[in-house]
């Protein structure tokens, strides 16, 4: 066993005693019980390494570290030489993990610890979770009034953990998913209101410990405080820009497959860069604080060699991106030296947030110098005749275009051709093998590696195997690194099992034949993340956020969690196989297409689920659009992006439901606050809409009346001070004997006038237009 492996694994397992103690399996504090658990595991499995790792549980608190004689005696008893280690190696590793434990969360048992206390929500610390395995196929983890976790729940947890640790290969890449599965909903400490998942604390301890080791820290450095005071660490951040242009600026046949392929390809490019950084700097996946939405952060060592490697990685990645996509897609990579103390708070200051703020400034400056890493960027590069790729619009030498894999009569660029194949394979993929670019079977390439599809029934190849939507390594070779990655990949199947087309989705609509498009993201997320005051808190928050969109969106689309979501605005019974395709969902945003009426309803389903998931503390804004299926996707993306921006600008926590007009002064809002729209729907829809594309009662033969109401609303929009609209509404409804349908629209709402708010007639179009689309024949 190498010293770096010992340190990384020691960090991962140092707090294993916490669930063991709460299960009441042994006696003593959690350090003692964790050590006994690992020693028993070693004896039961015959893996002596677990006995060596038990030292990291036994010696990771200040009181234990003072007893040098005991520590040295315990190390000698285990004969570190048989593991290829020296006494000094193990002693240094123990002190490093001890310090990393302190730095990872700044957490210690404060107040009155209580073993049964649950993990509180990072979004709403007033609510907590029951213990459960992390399983996206089961329940949506909703925080609530949970006051304790039963010891029998912990016993069941420890039993399952024992079983999997007994079988898992003793390597960071294999232990991380086991710990994530069972310790995500376990509190790292049992003091009141703790929001840090034990899994995230343990992996951040491992990350910081390995970075300390790589930075040359020793036991003496820890004792003297040098590793805490000196800038021995790097916070590395990468952020893609131009994502929307990269994904949506495509056209031609099979556009939806292209979109999904480009979204998946972007994910692979990001992983290629992240894994290259980890490989060259000698780190593990635990060092990745987050990697979501084209944005990643890594904790590393601050050494000249590490900085040199990062400079080379950045230059090569940016040059490759420019060569492949010209200026469409850019990756800014920066790093900030930090000391150990800057992983937390000090004197009331959030030093961790301040360090991240400095890093963010560096990233902003680098984005302003976009592609400045490339020498000779503006030198004339082509003398040959140029031709345009009909899919992505890039210009490149005519001779480099090649017959499309899906339509040999059309010539496309090599990248789009590979993405045609990727799009066709995505429904069958279990993941990808990361390997050398010139290896057989490479389908797409990143800046540093090639990716070979891992198909059902096939054998994965590559040094690292990225496996989709599972924490189980399955059949991948033991020699390969296991990289679980999660992706929201729900799609409506066409008759051949592939991805449905825009035409097929729009044809499944109720009423008018339209394609619905939804774009949304989380409000004020930057403010939320800026409050995080430790790597472990940031890791917990970003992981929980990312998993809502990558892990649970698919289940929401499938109609699950109805008991949480409740009744939402709906035009038809929710289908068993919704006519919806997720183009992208992850990080804090999503872009989804489908039958327009299902997309309309899905927006409210997602919002309700997200509200429950975050304990009611965070909000979403969404822009909706309904288009002819022949509309270019980039135009659809532009429209819903503008509508999302409008919802944000008008106060956030809002939905732009449908295109609307407003008075020229621009003071009236175009979007709706979610609760307001749901209230309007509950008020008006049951009076006029029978469901599944039919109007109610006598309105079935008087559809024109609803159109007339929309015309009257336009009178109000032209001049809100002119009251003719009120008289015309009263006359119209009275003439048809329907005044009881819209009593709110008859007359002038004086309270709205006093509050300087629009009259009810201004808001009614958001319901009427949707209903009229649903009943159109």
From Swiss-Prot:
Needed cofactors, names only, are: a divalent metal cation
Quick check: keyword ATP-binding in the entry? Answer: yes
Example of a GO MF term: ATP binding
**Documented EC number(s):** 3.1.-.-, 2.7.7.-
Q: What InterPro entries does the record tag this protein with?
A: Cas10-Cmr2_palm2, Cas10/Csm1, Cas10/Csm1_subtype-III-A, Csm1_B, GGDEF_dom, HD_domain, Rev_trsase/Diguanyl_cyclase
User: Which part of the chain is the GGDEF domain?
Assistant: 513-660
The UniProt entry's GO biological process terms, in alphabetical order, are: defense response to virus
Q: What is the free-text note on the cofactor?
A: Ni(2+) and Mn(2+), but not Mg(2+), Ca(2+), Zn(2+), Co(2+), or Cu(2+), is required for ssDNase activity.
Activity: how regulated: ssDNase activity is inhibited by EDTA.
Q: Which UniProt keywords apply?
A: Antiviral defense, ATP-binding, Endonuclease, Exonuclease, Hydrolase, Nuclease, Nucleotide-binding, Transferase
All copies of domain HD, residue ranges: 1-106
PROSITE patterns (UniProt xref) = GGDEF, HD
- Report quaternary structure and partners: Probably part of the Csm effector complex, that includes Cas10, Csm2, Csm3, Csm4, Csm5 and mature crRNA. Will form a homodimer in solution, interacts with Csm4, which is a tighter, better association than the homodimeric Cas10 and uses the same interface for interaction.
Q: What is known of its domains?
A: The N-terminal HD domain has ssDNase activity. The C-terminal GGDEF domain has the cOA synthesis activity.
Please state which protein family the record places this protein in: Belongs to the CRISPR-associated Cas10/Csm1 family.
Q: What does this protein do?
A: CRISPR (clustered regularly interspaced short palindromic repeat) is an adaptive immune system that provides protection against mobile genetic elements (viruses, transposable elements and conjugative plasmids). CRISPR clusters contain spacers, sequences complementary to antecedent mobile elements, and target invading nucleic acids. CRISPR clusters are transcribed and processed into CRISPR RNA (crRNA). A single-strand deoxyribonuclease (ssDNase) which digests linear and circular ssDNA; has 5'-3' and 3'-5' exonuclease activity as well as a less efficient endonuclease activity. Has a minimal size requirement; 100 nucleotide ssDNA (nt) is more efficiently digested than 50 or 25 nt ssDNA, while 14 nt ssDNA is not cleaved at all. It has no activity on dsDNA or ssRNA.
Further remarks about this protein from its record? Encoded in a type III-A CRISPR locus.
According to UniProt, the name of this protein is: CRISPR system single-strand-specific deoxyribonuclease Cas10/Csm1 (subtype III-A)
Per the record, the gene is csm1
